[in-house]
Curated annotation (Swiss-Prot):
This is Sodium channel protein type 10 subunit alpha. Expressed in nodose ganglia, but not in cortex, hippocampus, cerebellum, liver, heart and skeletal muscle. Tetrodotoxin-resistant channel that mediates the voltage-dependent sodium ion permeability of excitable membranes. Assuming opened or closed conformations in response to the voltage difference across the membrane, the protein forms a sodium-selective channel through which sodium ions may pass in accordance with their electrochemical gradient. Plays a role in neuropathic pain mechanisms. The channel consists of an ion conducting pore forming alpha-subunit regulated by one or more associated auxiliary subunits SCN1B, SCN2B and SCN3B; electrophysiological properties may vary depending on the type of the associated beta subunits. Found in a number of complexes with PRX, DYNLT1 and PDZD2. Interacts with proteins such as FSTL1, PRX, DYNLT1, PDZD2, S100A10 and many others. Interacts with NEDD4 and NEDD4L. Ubiquitinated by NEDD4L; which promotes its endocytosis. IV repeats lie at residues 1465-1764.
Length: 1962
C-alpha cells in the first residue's frame, strides 16, 4: 500500500483549468445519477455517513506541510480543491503567500466573468493579497480614530466611503454577488460591510442630512475589524454560541422577574410617592378651610421648598404611615405627592417600572438605595421580599448565566480538543501502516531486506546538515534554559495545541506522537534524521527532568555540547544552579542520565527497526512528514535568523583568559548558591516594605532614610545583575525571562536615580514596585497566579480586542446619538456650581467612561441622567444593550476563561510538586543548623530538657560541591529534614533516589495522606519536638528504618484507659486492617506501592494514641486525662485505678462520661446556647431606659455563664484534658466560656467600666459560634471553608501584593492632595468655590463665620494602609465615585481642588479595576471553586471510580428504581360524572386553563397606581370572572375525580388558591369600610399564588426544567450556606450594637439604618452582604472630630461623643465584606455551578426522568388494575404507544421477540422486564447492566410487594420458537394424515414403494427444528434450547435453590420435548 501523502518533493497543488471544471461537471452528473438510483433504496441512504469538509482544509486555515511546498508561480492563482468534500462542488481554492486557503465559486461572477477571465483573476489575486487586507485594516483604524473627533470635514468621510466601495467591488468581482457558493453576500461579515456602504450612500443621497441616526451607522465600521482579523471571528462565534445557550436562562429570568415585579406592584405601588411635607395646616391660622385655604394647601404641597430633604443630600425624605416605616421630623406630615424619587423613574407604580426596578435589583446596581427607599416608605418587614429577590433572583439567576456561558465555552474547547485528537489519530494510523505492512510481508514469508534498498529515500527538502547546524545551538540553549520551550509565546502555544503539542497540561493521549517538550529531539542519527520513535511521553520526560535541569532529559547520548567543557563553569549550568550536564557526562549518582533509554522502551519505530532497508524506506516517508511538522514548528520557534544566532554565539559568550574563567567560576558559585537566592528574596521583601513606608507628612530624616535605602537596594540589584551576566554570559543570561525582567527593572531604577536630581520622575518610581513580582520565582502560588493571569491574557487577547471594540462602538454610538442632547440639556442633571455633569457623552473620553462604568455594573444612574436629557427609548435601548451584551456575556466569558485556566493550571502543578527551589534548600540548611545548635546546647547542659534523640547519627550533607545537581540538593534537603528523626543518608538512599530520578519508569506511589511535596514540612517552624520526629518525611524505600524506629519505642501503660498500647494493638490492628483494605484502591494499591508512611507497615504507638478517641467511643469508656508526654515528664500524674481513692474517681469519670455523651445533655446545651445568643440581641441602645429588662439580662447572663462553666468542667472530667484540648471545637468553647467568666467576675468586682473589660464584653458576641459545632449543616460548610483557607489565604496574599503596587502608586500620585475647604451650613457640607479659596491659608484667612473647615477626604491615599481601603472601595464599586472625583479634581498638596483638573487620572482607576479588581476578585471565585472540587475528589464516593458509561447506567437505573406503576383514577360509573370526567381528563381542558391563567396574569400586569375608577371597576369585574372560572374548574374536577382529586399535589395547590381567592374577594367587600385599619395588599398578593400554576407548563419546557432542577438540587447546600451567613450576620450585628450605637447620623446611617437595635443592625448587614453601600455605613464611623462630629456630646448611657472609632470600623467592615461577599457568596456560586453541571449532564443523558414517567403513564392505560403485568398480545401496541427514545414503532413484533422477555403463566410480562429490555435497546449492551439490574430489582421488590410470586415459565423468544414448532408439527401431521388417508383409499400398485419414501414429517420436523434453533439470539441470556440457571428476572422467586430447581426441571422438560419432537411419527 503506498504512503498516503506522497513525498514532500512532489507538490500536490495543481492549477485550476477548464479541464478541471469539466471533470467537476462529470463528477456532479455521476453523483446525481447515483442519487436517483439510491432514492429507491432509502434505508441504505440513512445509514451512510455524509461526507464532511476536512478540518485542516477549512477556509482561513493553512494546509498541512505534507501537501508539499507551494511553488511561487501558484501563489494567488486558482488551484484545484484539495478537499475531497468539494470534489463535487463547482469551487476552486486560492492560496496566498502565507499559504492561507480561500475558496471561490467556479461559476461566472455577475454572469460575466468566468474563473479564467483576466479581470476576475486579477481581482482574486488582489483580494487574497496580505497587503490588501492590511490596507483595509489600517483604513478602518484611521476611520475609527477619526470618528472619535468631534468636528471632522465631510471630505474625509467621502475618502473612506470610496475606499470601502473599492474593497466591496474587488470582492464582488472575485467572488460573485450572491447567487453561488462562497459569493460576496454569502458571508455574514460582508453583509455588515455592504450595509455600511449602502447607508453611507443613502445618507448622502437624501436631503435629510440632519438625520444623525444614519450617521451613527458609520460606527458599525469599527465592527469591520472583526471580519479582517481571523482569530476574532472564532471568539465572536463563541459569543454567539453562548448567547444562543442563554435562551432558557433568559426565559426563566424574565419569568422570575415578572413574578417578583407583580408582587412588588401589589405591595409597593404608590408608596414611593410618600414624602415629608411641611404641615401646611399650621400656615392657615384661621384653621377653617375656606376656598382660599384649599388653594394655599395645594400650592403648599406642590412647592419643592416644602419637602423635607434627607440630611446631606438634595433628595426629599421618604416616609410611610406604618408603625415600622420611616417617620417625619417635627412640623412635617407624611403625604402622598405626585413625584417618585430619582427623576420620577424609581417606582413600583406600573408593571413596566416595577420590572425595571427588579432588573436593577437582579444586577445589584445601587440596589441599596432602592432597598432603603422602599423600607422607609413601606416598613421594615418587607426586608423579606428583598432577601428572596437577592438570594433567589440575583445570586441564582446571575450565576446561572455564568454557568451557562462557562459551559458553552467549555463545549467549544472540547470540540477543538476532539479535533486535535482526531488529527493525532490519523497521524498515528499513518505511522502504524509500515509496521502492519511489515507484519503482512513477514506472514507471507517474504524476505523484506532483499526487496528494496533505501537509496532514494525521499528526504525532506531541507538538507540534513543544515538542520543539524540549526539544532546544535538549540541544544545548548536547551541546556541552560528551564523555561524556554515551544510553549513560550501564545502564538506557538496555539499552533502547538492545534497540532496536539499542548503544554503538557492536558494528559498525553495514549501513544500520541505529538507529546514532547522541546522541538529539537536531538536523538540524532549520523545522517541527521530525527527518529520519531524516541519521544519519551510527556509524563516520562517530566519524571526524567524532575530533579535534573530542563534540557537533559531530551538529549541523546550521542550528541556533544558545542560549549567548551569543564574549565568553563557556565557550560552546563542552569541559572538556578541546577547542573544541566552536557550530555554524555555522568550525573552525580554515577548513573548515566539518558532519557533516550527510557524513551526507547516506548518507541513506535525503534532504531533496530530502521536497520532493514525496506522498513527504513517506509519509515523515511513517515519521518519526512514528521520532520516537516517539526520544521514548521521550529521555524515558528526561531526568533532570529541564523546569521544573528552565529553572531550572538560569537560575541555574547565570553571565553577569555584563564583568570577571567576563574572569576566566572567564583561568581558562578556565588550566584547559584541557595543562600544568594535567600538574600535576594529578603532584599526584595525589605525593599517592598521600604516603598510601602512612604506616606504624607514624612519628616525629612525619614525621607532621607528611605532615599538611602533606595540607593542601597538599587546598587545591590545592579550588582546581582552584573554578577549573573558575567557568570552565565549574556547569551545564556538573556534567555531567561526572569533575567530580562530583572534587567529592565534595574535599568529603570538607575535612570530614575540619575534623573532624581533634575526632577522627580514619580512614573519611573512606580516601576521599582514591579520588583515585588520577582518573589514569584520562589513563591509557587504567586507564580501560578501570575501564570494564570498570563495564560488568560494570552487566550484572552482576542477577547480583549472584542471587548475593546464593544466599548469603542458603544461609546461612539452614545457620542453620535446623545452628544448634542447632553450639551443642550446639561443643566437638568449637573450640580448647581458645575459647568458640566461628571458623566456625559459629549466627547469620546467621557462617553468611553460611561460605557466602562456600565461594564462595571453601574448603569442605572447614568441611564436616569440620559433619560432626563435625551429620548427615553434610545437611552433604555442603548444602556440595556451594553449592560446585557457587555456585562453579562463578555465579562462572564472572561470569568469562564479564568476558571478554565484554573482547572488547567492547578495551584499545585506538577512543576512545583517535584522541584525543590533553592529557597527551600537554603531554609532546610538553616533548619538543620538550628537543630544541631539546639542539640549541642542540650548536650552541653546535659540535662533532659528534651527527650533523648534516637541513636543513629545522621551524616549531614550540607556543603554542596559546585557541580552538585539539583538531585543532590534535593537529597540534602531531605536529609536535613529527616536528620532529627535519625535517618542516615545511606548509600541505599542515594541509590533509590538516583534510580527514581534517572529511570522514569519507576512508579513512585505516594500515600494520599502525605503532604504535597517532600519539603512541605520545612514550611512549618523548625521546632519539631521528639513526638513529631516520627512523623518526619520518610524517604521512599526506607521502610526498614521506619520499622526499626517503631520497634525502638517503649509503650508505657496508659493509666486512664485500663489497657496498655500493646493491649490495644490487637484491637486496633483488626480495625485498621479493614480500613487499609478499604483504602488500597484509593492509593492505587498495587504491589508496587511503596508508601513510606503507611500505617499497615508498622503500627506507630503514637498513631494508636491519636486514634484513641475513636476507639474510646467503641469501648464506651473515657480516655486518659493527660497526654503521654505529660505522663513521662510528671510520673505523679500516673494513677492506678484499681487502688482505693482512684477507683471512686474512675467511677465519677465514667458517670460524667455517660452524662456528657447523652443526647439530652447535648440538646439542653444547644437550647442554652440559643437562649444566651438571643439574650445578647436585647442589649441595645435603649437598654438603659428599660431597667427591668436590664436586671433580667444581668441575671440570665450569670445563669448562662454558670451553666457553661459546669458543662466545661463536666467535659474535662469525662473526656480528660487530652481529648478536650486536642479538639478545635472544644478550644472554641473554652475561649468563649472564659470571656463570659472574666466579664462576669469583673462586673462583680465593679471593674466593668475599664476599657479592656468593655472590649472583652463585646467579645461575648462570639457566643453563637458555639452553635457551629452542634449543627451538622453549618459544620459541613465550615469544614469545607476551613479546608479552603490555605488557598484563600494564598490568593489573599497575592492580591495584597498586587494591590500594594497600586496603593504605592496612589500614594505617589495623590498623597496629601485630597484636602479641601468646606463650608458647614446646618447639616449640609458644601465645597467652597475656587474663586474664594485657593489654598489652605486662604481657607483659614476667609473663615469669618467659623463655618469654613479645611478637611481631608475621609478615604484617601495619604499612606499605603489607607490606600488599601480606598482600593477596596474601588474594587467593590462602592464609594469609588468620591475617591475618583477627588483624584481627578486634585491639584497639589494644600490646594483647593478644581473641577476635572486632571481628567486622565480616571485611567489609573480604569487600569486598577481591570487588573486589581476584576482579575483578583475573580481569582477568589476560581480558587474557591477549584478548592471545593479538589476536596470533593478527596472525599468522593463511588462516582470517581466509575466510568462515564457506568454513571449513565447508574443514573438511569436510579431513576428507574424510584418509580412504580400507579393505578389510574377509575372512570366513575355515574354517566354525568363520567361525562365530566372525560372533559376534565382531556389535554385540551388543561391547555384552556393554562391560557386563562396567563390571561389572568396579564390583567394583573395592567394595574397601575392612581388608575381611574372606571379601570378599577373593570379590573375588579375581570378578577371576579377569573375567580369564578377557577372555582368552576375546581368544582368540576372534584365532582369528576371524587376523593382522588386530593391525591395530586397540583390539585391541592389549585384548591388552596381558589379558597384564598374567594376569601380575598369576600374580605375586600367587608373591609372597604375598614381600609384605614387593615391593608388589603396582602390579599392582593395571595391572588398572585395563581401565577404559580404556570409552573405546570414547565413540564413541557425541558431546558427551563433543567435550570429549576439545578436549583432544587442546590437548595440543601444553599440552606446550609444561608444558615452560616445568618450566624455571621448575627455575630456582627451584636458587635455593631456594642461598638457603634452612638455614631452621628450621616451618609448611610440614619434613624432606620443604624446600629442602635438588633433589627436595624440586621437591616444594615443584609445590605452589605452584597457589599452594597458599605462605604455609606463606614463614613460616619471614620469621623474623629469637628466638623463632622462632636466628641463631647452626652449620650443616654452616660458615655460621651458621637464620633466613631476608625480602626474598629475599618476592621469590622473589611472583615465582614471578605467573609460574606468573597467567601459565602462565592460558595453560593460554586454550589450553583456544580449543580448546574450535574443537572445538564442528567438532562443530556439518553434517558431522562420524563422518559420513565412517560413509560409508566402509558403503562397505566394498558394495566388499569396496576397488576404490574400486561399480556404478550398487548406488548406490540404498548411499544408503539410510547413516545421518545423508548418507543419501538410498528412493525415491531420481531424486535420484541428478539428481546427474549420472560413470560409468566397467562402469557403475561412484568413491567420491569419490559423497561429493562427497552432501556437496553436505547443504551446498548453493557456488562454493568446486570449488576445494576439486580439492585433495581431488590428496590422494586421492596417497594411493590405483589401478592403472588409469579415464576417465569418461558420467554418471548422461546414462546415464538414453540409457536413455530407447533405450527410445523401441525402442518406435518395434517399432511401425514392426509397422505395416510389417501394411501388407504387408493392402495399402491407397487407395495414396496412405501418403504422407499421416508415419512415426510420426520424430515420436516428435523429441518424446522434445526432452523429454529439457529434463530439469531441477540440477548445471549437465554438460548433456544435451555434456560441457564443464572437467568435474572424480577418475577423470580426469592431463594436461589428454587431458581436452580425450576431451571433444571425446565432443562429436563426441554430435553424431553426435543426428544419428542425429533422422534419419528407413528
Amino acid at each position: 500500500m503506498e504512503f498516503p501523502f506522497g513525498s514532500l518533493e512532489t507538490t500536490n497543488f495543481r492549477r485550476f483549468t477548464p479541464e478541471s471544471l469539466v471533470e467537476i461537471e462529470k463528477r456532479i452528473a455521476a453523483k446525481q445519477a447515483a442519487k436517483k438510483a439510491k432514492g429507491k433504496h432509502r434505508e441504505q441512504k440513512d445509514q451512510e455517513e455524509k461526507p464532511r469538509p476536512q478540518l485542516d482544509l477549512k477556509a482561513c486555515n493553512q494546509p498541512p506541510k505534507f501537501y508539499g511546498e507551494l511553488p511561487a508561480e501558484l501563489v494567488g492563482e486558482p488551484l484545484e480543491d484539495l478537499d475531497p468534500f468539494y470534489s463535487t462542488h463547482r469551487t476552486f481554492m486560492v492560496l496566498d503567500k502565507g499559504r492561507t486557503i480561500s475558496r471561490f465559486s467556479a461559476t461566472r461572477a455577475l454572469w460575466l466573468f468566468s474563473p479564467f477571465n483576466l479581470i476576475r483573476r486579477t481581482a482574486i489575486k488582489v483580494s487574497v493579497h496580505s497587503w490588501f487586507s492590511l490596507f483595509i485594516t489600517v483604513t478602518i483604524l484611521v476611520n475609527c480614530v477619526g470618528m472619535t473627533q468631534t468636528e471632522l470635514p465631510d471630505r474625509i468621510e467621502y475618502v473612506f466611503t470610496v475606499i470601502y466601495t473599492f474593497e466591496a467591488l474587488i470582492k464582488i468581482l472575485a467572488r460573485g454577488f450572491c447567487l453561488n457558493e462562497f459569493a460576496y453576500l454569502r458571508d455574514p461579515w460582508d453583509w455588515l460591510d455592504f450595509s455600511v456602504i449602502t447607508l453611507a450612500y443613502i445618507g448622502e443621497a437624501t436631503a435629510l442630512r440632519g438625520i444623525s441616526g444614519l450617521r451613527t451607522f458609520r460606527v458599525l465600521r469599527a465592527l469591520k475589524t472583526v471580519s479582517v482579523i481571523p482569530g476574532l471571528k472564532v471568539i465572536v462565534g463563541a459569543l454567539i454560541h453562548s448567547v444562543r445557550k442563554l435562551a432558557d436562562v433568559t426565559i426563566l429570568t424574565v419569568f422570575c422577574l415578572s413574578v417578583f415585579a407583580l408582587v412588588g406592584l401589589q405591595l409597593f405601588k404608590g408608596n414611593l410617592k410618600n414624602k415629608c411635607v411641611k404641615n401646611c395646616a399650621a400656615l392657615n391660622e384661621t384653621g377653617n378651610y375656606s376656598s382660599y385655604g384649599k388653594q394655599e394647601w395645594n400650592f403648599c404641597h406642590r412647592d419643592e421648598d416644602f419637602y423635607y430633604n434627607k440630611p446631606g443630600t438634595s433628595d426629599p425624605l421618604l416616609c410611610g404611615n406604618g408603625s415600622d416605616a420611616g417617620h417625619c421630623p417635627k412640623g412635617y406630615l407624611c403625604l402622598k405627592t405626585s413625584d417618585n424619587p430619582d427623576f420620577n423613574y424609581t417606582s413600583f407604580d406600573s408593571f413596566a417600572w416595577a420590572f425595571l426596578s427588579l432588573f436593577r435589583l437582579m444586577t445589584q446596581d445601587s440596589w441599596e438605595r432602592l432597598y432603603q427607599q422602599t423600607l422607609r416608605a413601606s416598613g421594615k418587614m418587607y426586608m423579606v421580599f428583598f432577601v428572596l429577590v437577592i438570594f433567589l433572583g440575583s445570586f441564582y439567576l446571575v450565576n446561572l448565566i455564568l454557568a451557562v456561558v462557562t459551559m458553552a465555552y467549555e463545549e467549544q474547547n472540547q470540540a477543538t480538543i476532539d479535533e486535535i485528537e482526531a488529527k493525532e489519530k490519523t497521524f498515528q494510523e499513518t505511522l502504524e501502516m509500515p509496521r502492519k505492512e511489515q507484519e503482512v510481508l513477514a506472514a507471507l514469508g517474504i524476505d523484506t531486506a532483499s526487496l528494496h534498498s533505501c537509496n532514494g529515500s525521499p528526504l525532506p527538502s531541507k538538507n540534513a546538515s543544515e538542520r543539524m547546524r540549526r539544532m546544535k545551538p538549540r541544544v545548548s540553549e536547551g541546556s541552560t534554559d528551564d523555561n524556554k520551550s515551544p510553549q513560550s509565546d501564545p502564538y506557538n502555544q496555539r499552533r502547538m495545541s492545534f497540532l496536539g503539542l499542548t503544554s503538557g497540561r492536558r494528559r498525553a493521549s495514549h501513544g500520541s506522537v505529538f507529546h514532547f517538550r522541546t522541538p529539537c529531539l536531538d536523538t540524532s542519527f549520523p545522517d541527521g534524521v530525527t527518529d520519531d520513535g524516541v519521544f519519551p511521553g510527556d509524563r516520562e520526560s517530566h519524571r526524567g527532568s524532575l530533579l535534573l535541569g530542563g534540557g537533559t532529559s531530551q538529549q541523546g547520548p550521542l550528541l556533544r555540547s558545542p560549549l567548551p567543557q569543564p574549565p568553563n563553569p557556565g557550560s552546563g549550568h542552569g541559572e538556578d544552579g541546577h547542573s544541566t550536564l552536557p550530555t554524555g557526562e555522568l550525573a552525580p549518582g554515577g548513573i548515566e542520565v539518558s532519557a533516550f533509554d527510557a524513551g526507547q522502551k516506548k518507541t513506535f519505530l525503534s532504531a533496530e527497526y530502521l536497520n532493514e532497508p525496506f522498513r527504513a524506506q517506509r519509515a523515511m516517508s513517515v519521518v519526512s512528514i514528521m520532520t516537516s511538522v517539526l520544521e514548521e514548528l521550529e521555524e515558528s520557534e526561531r526568533r532570529c535568523p541564523p546569521c544573528l544566532t552565529s553572531f550572538a554565539q560569537k560575541y555574547l559568550i565570553w571565553e577569555c583568559c584563564p583568570t577571567w574563567v576563574k572569576l566566572k567560576t567564583v561568581l558562578f558559585g556565588i550566584v547559584t548558591d541557595p543562600f544568594a537566592e535567600l538574600t535576594t528574596t529578603l532584599c526584595i521583601v525589605v525593599n517592598t516594605v521600604f516603598m510601602a513606608m512612604e506616606h504624607h507628612g514624612m519628616s525629612s530624616a525619614f525621607e532621607a532614610m528611605l532615599q538611602i535605602g533606595n540607593i542601597v537596594f538599587t546598587v545591590f540589584f545592579t550588582a546581582e545583575m552584573v554578577f549573573k551576566i558575567i557568570a552565565f554570559d549574556p547569551y545564556y543570561y538573556f534567555q531567561k525571562r526572569w533575567n530580562i525582567f530583572d534587567c529592565i527593572i534595574v535599568t529603570v531604577s538607575l535612570i530614575e536615580l540619575g534623573a532624581a536630581r533634575k526632577g522627580s520622575l514619580s512614573v519611573l518610581r512606580t516601576f521599582r514596585l514591579l520588583r515585588v513580582f520577582k518573589l514569584a520565582k520562589s513563591w509557587p502560588t504567586l507564580n501560578t497566579l501570575i501564570k494564570i493571569i498570563g495564560n488568560s491574557v494570552g487566550a484572552l487577547g482576542n477577547l480583549t480586542i472584542i471587548l475593546a471594540i464593544i466599548v469603542f462602538v458603544f461609546a461612539l454610538v452614545g457620542k453620535q446619538l446623545l452628544g448634542e442632547n447632553y450639551r443642550d440639556n446639561r443643566r437638568n442633571i449637573s450640580a448647581p456650581n458645575e459647568e458640566w455633569p461628571r458623566w456625559h457623552m459629549h466627547d469620546f473620553f467621557h462617553s468611553f467612561l460611561i460605557v466602562f462604568r456600565i461594564l462595571c455594573g453601574e448603569w442605572i444612574e447614568n441611564m436616569w441622567a440620559c433619560m432626563e436629557v435625551g429620548q427615553k427609548s434610545i437611552c433604555l435601548i442603548l444602556f440595556l444593550t451594553v449592560m446585557v451584551l457587555g456585562n453579562l456575556v463578555v465579562l462572564n466569558l472572561f470569568t469562564a476563561l479564568l476558571l478554565n485556566s484554573f482547572s488547567a493550571d492547578n495551584l499545585a502543578t506538577p512543576d512545583e510538586d517535584g522541584e525543590v527551589n533553592n529557597l527551600q534548600v537554603a531554609l532546610a540548611r538553616i533548619q538543620a543548623f538550628g537543630h544541631r545548635t539546639k542539640k549541642a546546647i542540650c548536650n552541653f547542659f546535659t540535662r533532659p530538657c528534651l527527650l533523648p534523640w534516637p541513636k543513629a547519627e545522621p551524616q549531614l550533607v550540607v556543603k554542596l560541591p559546585l557541580s552538585s545537581s539539583k538531585a543532590e540538593n534535593h537529597i540534602a534537603a531531605n536529609a536535613a529534614v529527616g536528620s532529627p528523626g535519625g535517618l542516615s543518608v545511606s548509600r541505599g538512599l542515594r541509590d533509590d533516589h538516583s534510580d527514581f530520578i534517572t529511570n522514569p519508569n519507576i512508579w513512585v506511589s505516594v500515600p494520599i495522606a502525605e503532604g504535597e511535596s517532600d519539603l512541605d514540612d520545612l514550611e512549618e517552624d523548625g521546632e519539631e519536638d521528639s513526638q513529631s520526629s516520627q512523623q518526619e518525611v520518610i524517604l521512599q524505600g526506607q521502610e526498614q528504618l521506619q520499622v526499626e524506629t517503631c520497634e525502638g519505642h517503649t509503650a508505657p501503660r496508659s493509666p486512664g484507659s485500663g489497657m496498655s498500647s500493646e493491649d490495644l494493638a490487637s484491637y486496633v490492628d483488626e480495625k485498621w486492617k479493614d480500613e487499609a483494605v478499604a483504602q488500597a484502591p484509593a492509593e492505587g494499591g498495587d504491589d508496587s506501592s511503596s508508601s513510606g508512611g503507611s500505617t499497615v507497615d508498622c503500627l506507630d504507638p503514637e498513631e494508636i494514641l491519636r486514634k484513641i478517641p475513636e476507639l474510646a467511643d467503641d469501648l464506651e469508656e473515657p480516655d486518659d486525662c493527660f497526654t503521654e508526654g505529660c505522663l513521662r515528664r510528671c510520673p505523679c500524674c500516673k494513677v492506678d485505678i484499681s487502688k482505693f481513692p482512684w477507683t471512686v474517681g474512675w467511677q465519677v469519670r465514667k458517670t460524667c462520661y455517660r452524662i456528657v455523651e447523652h443526647s439530652w445533655f447535648e440538646s439542653f446545651i444547644i437550647f442554652m446556647i440559643l437562649l444566651s445568643s438571643g439574650s445578647l440581641a436585647f442589649e441595645d441602645y435603649h437598654l438603659d431606659q428599660k431597667p427591668t429588662v436590664k436586671a433580667l439580662l444581668e441575671y440570665t447572663d450569670r445563669m448562662f455563664t454558670f451553666i457553661f462553666v459546669l458543662e466545661m468542667l463536666l467535659k474535662w472530667v469525662a473526656y480528660g484534658f487530652k481529648k478536650y484540648f486536642t479538639n478545635a471545637w472544644c478550644w472554641l468553647d473554652f475561649l468563649i466560656v472564659n470571656i463570659s467568666l472574666i466579664s462576669l467576675i469583673a462586673k462583680i468586682l465593679q471593674y466593668s467600666d475599664v476599657a479592656s473589660i468593655k472590649a472583652l464584653r463585646t467579645l461575648r458576641a462570639l457566643r453563637p459560634l458555639r452553635a457551629l459545632s452542634r449543627f451538622e449543616g453549618m459544620r459541613v460548610v465550615v469544614d469545607a471553608l476551613v479546608g479552603a483557607i490555605p488557598s484563600i489565604m494564598n490568593v489573599l496574599l497575592v492580591c495584597l501584593i498586587f494591590w500594594l503596587i497600586f496603593s504605592t502608586m496612589g500614594v505617589n500620585f495623590f498623597a496629601g492632595k485630597f484636602g479641601r475647604c468646606i463650608n458647614k451650613t446646618n447639616e449640609y457640607f458644601s465645597l467652597v468655590p475656587l474663586s474664594i479659596v485657593n489654598n489652605i491659608s486662604d481657607c483659614k484667612y476667609q473663615n469669618h463665620t467659623g463655618s469654613f473647615f479645611w478637611v481631608n477626604v475621609k478615604v484617601n491615599f495619604d499612606n499605603v494602609a489607607m490606600g488599601y481601603l480606598a482600593l477596596l472601595q474601588v474594587a467593590t464599586f462602592k464609594g469609588w465615585m468620591d475617591i475618583m472625583y477627588a483624584a481627578v479634581d486634585a491639584r497639589d498638596v494644600n490646594l483647593q481642588p478644581k473641577w476635572e483638573d486632571n481628567v486622565y487620572m480616571y485611567l489609573y482607576f480604569v487600569i486598577f479595576i481591570i487588573f486589581g479588581g476584576f482579575f483578583t476578585l475573580n481569582l477568589f471565585v476560581g480558587v474557591i471553586i477549584d478548592n471545593f472540587n479538589q476536596q470533593k475528589k478527596k472525599l468522593g464516593g463511588q462516582d470517581i471510580f466509575m466510568t462515564e458509561e457506568q454513571k449513565k447506567y447508574y443514573n438511569a437505573m436510579k431513576k428507574l428504581g424510584s418509580k412504580k406503576p400507579q393505578k389510574p383514577i377509575p372512570r366513575p360509573l355515574n354517566k354525568y360524572q363520567g361525562f365530566v370526567f372525560d372533559i376534565v381528563t382531556k389535554q385540551a381542558f388543561d391547555i384552556v386553563i393554562m391560557v386563562l391563567i396567563c390571561l389572568n396574569m396579564i390583567t394583573m400586569m395592567v394595574e397601575t397606581d392612581e388608575q381611574s375608577a372606571e379601570k378599577t371597576k373593570i379590573l375588579n369585574k375581570i378578577n371576579q370572572f377569573f375567580v369564578a372560572v377557577f372555582t368552576g374548574e375546581c368544582v368540576m374536577k372534584m365532582f369528576a375525580l371524587r376523593h382522588y382529586y386530593f391525591t395530586n399535589g397540583w390539585n391541592v395547590f389549585d384548591f388552596i388558591v381558589v379558597v384564598l381567592s374567594i376569601g380575598s374577594l369576600v374580605f375586600s367587600v367587608i373591609l372597604t369600610s375598614l381600609e384605614n385599619y387593615f391593608s388589603p395588599t396582602l390579599f392582593r398578593v395571595i391572588r398572585l399564588a395563581r401565577i404559580g400554576r404556570i409552573l405546570r407548563l414547565i413540564r413541557a419546557a425541558k431546558g427551563i426544567r433543567t435550570l429549576l432542577f439545578a436549583l432544587m438540587m442546590s437548595l440543601p447546600a444553599l440552606f446550609n450556606i444561608g444558615l452560616l451567613l445568618f450566624l455571621v450576620m448575627f455575630i456582627y450585628s451584636i458587635f455593631g450594637m456594642a461598638s457603634f450605637p452612638h455614631v452621628s447620623w450621616e451618609a448611610g446611617i440614619d434613624d432606620m439604618f443604624n446600629f442602635q437595635t438588633f433589627a436595624n443592625s440586621m437591616l444594615c448587614l443584609f445590605q452589605i452582604t452584597t457589599s452594597a453601600g458599605w462605604d455609606g455605613l463606614l463614613s460616619p464611623i471614620l469621623n474623629t472630630g469637628p466638623p463632622y462630629c462632636d466628641p463631647n456630646l452626652p449620650n443616654s448611657n452616660g458615655s460621651r461623643g458621637n464620633c466613631g472609632s476608625p480602626a474598629v470600623g475599618i476592621l469590622f467592615f473589611t472583615t465582614y465584606i471578605i467573609i460574606s461577599f468573597l467567601i459565602v457568596v462565592n460558595m453560593y456560586i460554586a454550589v450553583i455551578l456544580e449543580n448546574f453541571n450535574v443537572a445538564t449532564q442528567e438532562s443530556s443523558e439518553p434517558l431522562s426522568e420524563d422518559d420513565f414517567d412517560m413509560f409508566y403513564e402509558t403503562w397505566e392505560k394498558f394495566d388499569p388494575e396496576a397488576t404490574q403485568f400486561i399480556t404478550f398480545s398487548a406488548l406490540s401496541d404498548f411499544a408503539d404507544t410510547l413516545s421518545g427514545p423508548l418507543r419501538i414503532p410498528k412493525p415491531n413484533q420481531n424486535i420484541l421477540i428478539q428481546m427474549d422477555l420472560p413470560l409468566v403463566p397467562g402469557d403475561k410480562i412484568h413491567c420491569l422486564d419490559i423497561l429493562f429490555a427497552f432501556t437496553k435497546n436505547v443504551l446498548g449492551e453493557s456488562g454493568e447492566l446486570d449488576s445494576l439490574k439486580a439492585n433495581i430489582e431488590e428496590k422494586f421488590m421492596a417497594t411493590n410487594v405483589s401478592k403472588a410470586s409469579y415464576e417465569p415459565i418461558a420467554t418471548t423468544l422461546r414462546w415464538k420458537q414453540e409457536d413455530i414448532s407447533a405450527t410445523v408439527i401441525q402442518k406435518a401431521y395434517r399432511s401425514y394424515v392426509l397422505h395416510r388417508s389417501m394411501t388407504i383409499s387408493n392402495p399402491p400398485a407397487v407395495p414396496r414403494a412405501e418403504e422407499a419414501v421416508p415419512p415426510p414429517d420426520e424430515a420436516f420436523v428435523e429441518f424446522m427444528v434445526n432452523e429454529n434453533c439457529a434463530l439469531p439470539d441477540k440477548s445471549e441470556t437465554a438460548s433456544a434450547a435451555s434456560f441457564p440457571p443464572s437467568y435474572d428476572s424480577v418475577t423470580r422467586g426469592l431463594s436461589d435453590q428454587i431458581n436452580m430447581s425450576t431451571s433444571s426441571s425446565m432443562q429436563n422438560e426441554d430435553e424431553g420435548t426435543s426428544k419428542k419432537v425429533t422422534a419419528p411419527g407413528p
